[in-house]
Amino acid sequence: ERHTAVAAVDPKGRFARNESSFRDRISDIVSEKNRYKLIVSYACPWATRCLSVLYLKGLDDGIEVEIVHPTWQKTRRKRGKDDENEEEEEDDGHAGWVFPNENSRWIQHLSGIESAKFEVQEYHTRKDPKKTKKTEFYSIRDFYEEHDNSYKGPFTVPILYDQTEKRIVNNESSEIIRDLNARFQPLAKNATLDLYPESKRKEIDEMNE
C-alpha cells in the first residue's frame, strides 16, 4: 500500500521518517559535467540541505538541478485532451511531490487553498541527455515507478540521478551531501571547502543521528 508521507507519524504526532531505499554511493571522482541531476523541493528540509551543499561547493554549473512544486498533489491524475488515447489513472488516495508543467502554473492545495505561482520555464527541463526524446513525468511517484516498477514508496526527494545510466543513485540526503562534498571536486568552484572535515566527523555524525 502506498501512503502519503504525512501519514508517517508516531502516536504522539511526530513525523517518523521512513528509511531511504536507494543507497548507492558515488565511488569514483566525477568530472563529467551534468551527468548527474539533483531533484529537490524547496519545501523539504532534507532536500534543501543538499541544495545548500551544492551551492556552497559551487556545483551549480556541474550538476543539473530540478525543482518540484512545493505543494503536494494527488499523484494519480485524469488524462488531458492530449492523452485521450490513454486510460485514466485510478486515484488511490496518494498525494506527494509533482513536477510543474506549462499548463498548470497555479496548483491548488488539496485543502482547496491555492498555492503561490511557480514559474515553470526557469527550472523545468527534464530532457533525455542524448537529446533524442523528452520523457514526461507527472509526479515523483511516476519517476520512481518508471525506474523500478516494483517500488512501493515512499516517493521522496531529494533524488540524486545518473542521467547517463538512467538510474536513481541515492535518495538519502545525509549520503548525498557527503558525496557532493567529496566526489565532484573537478566540477566544484569551491573545491577546497570541506564541509565534512576529519576533525569534526564524529561530532557531525552524532548530530545527524
Language-model features: locations:
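GST-like domain detector, emphasizing the conserved glutathione-binding G-site
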Residues: 1-209
